[in-house]
């Protein structure tokens, strides 16, 4: 909501908590109708893609939500953004600096825990193969989001870029792993 207010695009999402677990089937129907499959299911407070799953149907959605709830009592369900995975390191306090944009070429369907730490076949290309104008836009958006959310020190800002060049902020990691 804060990022939307500042014209920073993000995937559409819904959050569910342990409190509203009694009516999951109804929520699943509403969420699938609004966001459409495939969906990404994430525990709110985990890192390294732990507990994140892609759901292509209701059965996978239920399994993914149960997995996410095993890690946290709040779960985010996001629409799938088909595009390239990009990342930017942002460092500083009052006048933060953004690094070059890097691109993650995941060896799996998405950059999950296995793609980061187990399989070792994912690639990180720095700088990403994007034009200078898009590089500037992404770096400026990363700094803007960093400031808007009150980040300090060091963060990694993750993005998706669609085939037509639309950029969506995926998340800000305030304890980034900077995995290769």
State where each predicted segment sits.
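Phosphate-binding site of ATP-dependent enzymes
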Residues: 56-137, 161-168
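Internal helical hairpin/lid segments
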Residues: 123-124, 134-155
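Active-site nucleotide/adenylate-binding loops and adjacent lid/helix of ATP-dependent enzymes
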Residues: 1-78, 82-83
